[in-house]
Amino acid sequence: MSKGTVVGAGNVGATCANVLAFNEVADEVVMLDVKEGVSEGKAMDMMQTAQLLGFDTTVVGCTNDYAQTANSDVVVITSGIPRKPGMTREELIGVNAGIVKSVAQNILKYSPNAILVVISNPMDTMTYLSLKSLGLPKNRIIGMGGALDSSRFKYFLSQALGCNANEVEGMVIGGHGDTTMIPLARLATYKGIPVSKLLSAEKLQEVVASTMVGGATLTKLLGTSAWYAPGAAGAYVVESIIHNQKKMVPCSVYLEGEYGESDLCIGVPVILGKNGIEKIVELELTAEEKELFAKSAAAVHKTNEALKEVGAL
């Protein structure tokens, strides 16, 4: 019997749990939150859609009862405050570091073999914090960001091409931030045809720019962080792990020399399966892409330094 847990029953966490249930990714999905009644209410609401939508997954909600999460295969951490308009992901670090560290430690008491998927922002830094504070092997700590950024990239590509997003392949690597992500336009394709042969350089650059500010654009429109795509991206990562699909998905993972970088978690393509990260895929980058990746890594390192400043590491 497979089991997934989502910690944090806010917009992103509840969306992730809902997608996991609807797609029957696990036999049981547990939602845990600190706010009394919220996860229980949302779980009940979801279960009342089971007959309408035709899924058999059981969704359970609980308030701060980590015993309910016992023996989870995969745990998604969405806990923390959401990003407010004008706030950078990095400004969240002081608050969210303490929350994420506490959650991860409590989860492992009851699910010592669980694979952790981190969504909390700043995502690369929270993934790094989890890895360093827990001492788990690096294949078991995964940051979701690249899956979301790549989905946004494919959306903007499909809009420019006038096609379905499922007909487009595209990948975003680097940090999960407005200035640190690197949409790899050179490798994007539509039905196997390089997008660079179908769109002008100017249009392609517009797509890249829109992708990079995709999260901030939604925050301005919504007044808070987006939740449908982030929650779905988290569920997408969980599905590849629990179902051992061996999908290649860009995720924030710990590097030890890959792409010329070490001692940080940053977005690169990986193969996801039952062991979490089955393999880090090293792409052959151009000189320009290598330079952008090095700058992105430097920015992530700088944000990670704040963990020591706030006493989280």
Where are these regions (language model features)?
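Glycine-rich Rossmann-fold phosphate-binding loop(s) that bind the pyrophosphate
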Residues: 9-10
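N-terminal Rossmann-fold NAD(P) dinucleotide-binding loop
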Residues: 13-14
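Short beta-strand element of Class I
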Residues: 26-30
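Conserved N-terminal Rossmann-fold NAD(P) cofactor-binding segment
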Residues: 32-72, 301-310
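Rossmann-like NAD(P)-binding element
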Residues: 52-114
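Rossmann-like NAD(P)(H) cofactor-binding subdomain of soluble oxidoreductases
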Residues: 88-154
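C-terminal substrate-binding/catalytic lobe of Rossmann-fold NAD(P)-dependent dehydrogenases
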Residues: 134-140, 149-313
